[in-house]
Design a protein with these regions (language model features):
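Short glycine/serine/threonine-rich phosphate/pyrophosphate-binding segments
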Residues: 62-64, 130-135, 159-160, 179-188, ...
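Long amphipathic alpha-helical segments
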Residues: 1-84, 88, 93-94
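Glycine-rich phosphate/diphosphate-binding loop of Rossmann-like nucleotide-binding domains
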Residues: 117-158
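Glycine-rich phosphate-binding loop
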Residues: 164-202
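Short glycine-rich or small-residue beta-strand-to-loop segments that form or flank ligand, phosphate
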Residues: 53-54, 120-126, 175-177, 229-230
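Glycine-rich oxoanion-binding loops at beta->alpha junctions
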Residues: 106-110, 147-168, 213-214, 230
Length: 248
């Protein structure tokens, strides 16, 4: 429940549109809804501005669906990350408006389309191989109501590709830099823009990249100002933080 939805609910009870019994039934789900396999945080949007997101890894398909159905039953938009096509196909049987970004492994269900911000988030990626992380970040940012623009395959091996889009990137309120290998893109971008850069190291690379650890350490040790770093392959975390900045 968002702050606006809470205020609207209070008004309907006050005006008599909803009875006291209906109010009690509604409030029964606070502060969480227990569905057996999970306790859904029904107040998170009220506290943080965005509702609970379902992280799929480690959960069975049945558990994911049970949680999604419980969130959807309250009319709240649903975002599921690190998921699969099996969940999408089963969810589509009960929620026809469901969307699935297969590369980003993200499912979204929007009962109410969020109004997009006037300012935008730029997602800049070093290579095509970083695409899965880019798509996770993109779907998350859009779900949270952000105008979001992607600039793909613009890594340091060909700086002219980055420079060609620099004017648009500089127009963003916050930049997400997605890169594997040595992770140099974040530092280069931070030296060219005057907005926060959120760096996402990816697990793309050969042996000595250690599954993204080399990029993570390089980004943490950036000489350029304004770089903050999230965990390896964490497109969701980068987009969530970027959304908070973009909504300021």
């Amino acid at each position: 429940m968002t702050k606006d939805e809470a205020l609207n609910f209070i008004r309907t009870v006050k005006s008599g549109e909803k009875s006291e019994r209906e109010a009690i039934e509604f409030l029964r789900y606070f502060p969480f809804s227990d569905v057996g396999c999970a306790k859904i945080d029904t107040q998170r949007a009220l506290r943080n501005g965005a509702g609970e997101v379902i992280y799929s890894e480690g959960k069975t398909d049945d558990e994911i669906l049970r949680i999604a159905e419980a969130i959807g039953a309250r009319g709240q938009n649903i975002l599921i990350t690190r998921t699969n096509e099996r969940v999408f196909e089963r969810l589509r049987e009960i929620l026809p408006q469901v969307e699935f970004n297969a590369r980003g492994r993200v499912i979204s269900v929007k009962f109410k389309e969020p109004a997009l911000t006037q300012s935008y988030i730029a997602i800049v990626s070093a290579g095509t191989a970083d695409g899965a992380v880019v798509e996770e970040a993109y779907e998350t940012a859009r779900f949270l109501g952000n105008d979001t623009r992607k600039f793909s395959d613009a890594g340091v091996a060909g700086l002219h590709r980055l420079i060609a889009n620099l004017e648009q990137i500089r127009g963003a309120k916050v930049v997400i830099a997605v890169a594997g290998m040595e992770g140099a893109l974040a530092s280069v971008l931070a030296g060219l823009v005057s907005v926060p850069v959120i760096a996402v190291p990816t697990s793309v690379g050969y042996g000595a990249s250690f599954g993204g650890l080399a990029a993570l350490l390089a980004m943490l040790n950036s000489c350029a100002n304004g770089v903050s770093v999230v965990n390896i392959d964490n497109g969701f975390g980068a987009a969530y933080n970027a959304s908070l900045i973009n909504h300021l």
